[in-house]
């Protein structure tokens, strides 16, 4: 899937409609993973996983840390302990 990237946001639009998005605005130097959305037509295709991975790359690229508010992001990080060093302590 082709994602558009902005600071603190990665998303996909199809025919003018938002179909996938993760938001992780920076607060006090920490990326707050606060929302993940995938359109029902895309569920089960690994799109949310792709969004979190792209966000992780973006946060790592700027040397940041992450705080998890979004339940999907919490679950994703629990299943990917190799990324735990990114989490705010």
Please state what every model-predicted region is.
Residues 2-3:
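Short loop/turn motifs at secondary-structure junctions and domain boundaries
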Residues 44-56:
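Conserved acetyl-CoA-binding loop-helix of GNAT-fold acetyltransferases
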Residues 54-89:
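C-terminal structural segments of small proteins and small subunits
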Residues 8-19:
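Conserved beta-hairpin
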Residues 36-43:
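A short, internal acetyl-CoA/4′-phosphopantetheine-binding micro-motif in the GNAT/acyltransferase core
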Residues 17-25, 32:
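Conserved beta-strand in the GNAT
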